């Protein structure tokens, strides 16, 4: 009974810098983060989608990133015990990808918040949340 990390890939990333953003202004960033876990024979697929779009308040950029982590599991394994570990393994890569996207736009890198996957996911196979984050200035 083991979960083995195979790889991680960014399947899609879209980043748009908002024109005419005000310098030295605080922006309240509320990303929508979803995690979907599914099993295919001897694989566990962990897909994260992170979205940030304009809502009621202006923000300096919009993005959508889809990242997939692939794990190997034994055919007889009950993967419900692996869901938290899989999400905990992939999420740091997702955080780094988002930070790198913002850094390449020549703005301060945006770090997604830390998330306690055990609290959020538990044994669920699909979770979506909006995470309040510190203001970005």
For each feature predicted by the language model, list its residue ranges.
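N-terminal intrinsically disordered, cationic/polar leader segments
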Residues: 1-89, 96-137
């Amino acid at each position: 009974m083991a979960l083995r990390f195979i790889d991680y890939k960014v399947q899609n990333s879209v980043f748009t810098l908002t024109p005419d953003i005000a310098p030295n202004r605080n922006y309240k960033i509320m990303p929508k983060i979803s995690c979907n876990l599914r099993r295919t024979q001897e694989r566990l697929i962990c897909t994260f989608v992170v979205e940030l779009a304009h809502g009621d308040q202006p923000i300096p950029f919009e993005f959508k990133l889809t990242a997939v982590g692939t794990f190997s599991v034994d055919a007889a394994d009950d993967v419900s015990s692996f869901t938290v570990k899989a999400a905990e393994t992939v999420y740091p890569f997702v955080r780094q990808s988002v930070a790198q996207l913002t850094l390449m736009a020549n703005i301060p890198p945006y770090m997604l918040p830390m998330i306690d996957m055990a609290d959020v996911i538990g044994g669920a196979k699909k979770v979506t949340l909006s995470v309040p984050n510190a203001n970005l200035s």
